[in-house]
Amino acid sequence: RPAAASGKLPAVVVVHENRGLNPYIEDVTRRLGIAGFLALAPDALTPLGGYPGNDDQGRELQSKRNSEEMTQDFIAAAELLQKHPLGNGRVGAVGFCYGGGIANTLAVRIPAVIAAAVPFYGRQPASEDVPKIKAPLLIHYAELDTRINAGWPAYEQALKAARVRYEMHL
């Protein structure tokens, strides 16, 4: 929460890459607070002791976590923010790499909670799940990330068919 903020704030759950809550994601979260958001960045590695201090070990640790349990952790974070007394009930999700996929997943799984999602180069949801998305999306892909980008044409087609508001940047 920004020190100078007054009143209820929009909230953002910030989802890290596939290596835990590293200093970069902590800084993104801090900057969102400065910008006037109630921001929360859970560490998926908390059950294993938290981010170990370097990304290589973080990747190794995260590979040991159950994927659905991690997803449930981020769902719980978004639901907590929606009900937080300092928040205004509106919750966005932003994620990077693995976290971009989770931002998409949150938009699918908890559409009554997620008011906006901003995935950075995350995996796309299954086409049949896209109609569940009610939030506008601001999607970012990296030009040379051919693995993730390969899913974009089908995702875009599903977004258009479901009339989901989106903007994509490559």
Enumerate the predicted regions with their spans.
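Primarily recognizes the serine-hydrolase "nucleophile elbow" in alpha/beta-hydrolase
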Residues: I75-K134
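The conserved SAM/SAH-binding core of class I Rossmann-like methyltransferase domains
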Residues: L40-P42, F120, H169
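Active-site-adjacent alpha-helix of alpha/beta-hydrolase-fold enzymes
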Residues: R31-I34, E143-L170
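Serine-hydrolase catalytic machinery in alpha/beta-hydrolase-like enzymes
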Residues: R1-L86
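Short N-terminal helix/helix-N-cap motif within the alpha/beta-hydrolase-1
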Residues: N22-E26, G49, G101, E128, ...
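Short beta-strand/loop motif that positions the catalytic acidic residue
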Residues: I133, I139-Y141
